[in-house]
């Protein structure tokens, strides 16, 4: 709302409304950017009890005794987080839809690209949190562990910036940079593959943990 007010004030003073969609969604204080910045703080609270609660309550024994495999258990937990992510994206889409109704020449491509980037980021966070939650029966430990990993992946691109080789590696591994490109309106197959690899890797680790 503040950004819309600033843009309206600038328009009143005779300045251009240029790149309004980019400013409102992907700018430094844009909607998608703010969601991206705080998502890694919020996701550990959602994922910390996915498996650790099963351990602490003893219900994991019932799951082992039921006719389901470890793969089914992990994929079922992950599917619930994917559905939650769709609900969150639906809420954001309502805001985007409102912007499309009130803004002339709204950048739908950029908006949908940003939603895709946030959804893939949420799925990656969920897979990481699910894996960490499978390592311990203590929910707080799982939450803190997930937060540490997500924070490291978000700020990894700030490490070793004075060395070109290290800078290239940390940039490639930094998860926020991948979603940031999509929020900016650029969908690259490399970024999509990156998220797919992260999700597959941590889900596989979680399945191996249950099988051990």
Describe the predicted segments one by one.
Residues 43-47, 95, 127-128, 205-206:
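Hydrophobic/aromatic residues in alpha-helical transmembrane segments
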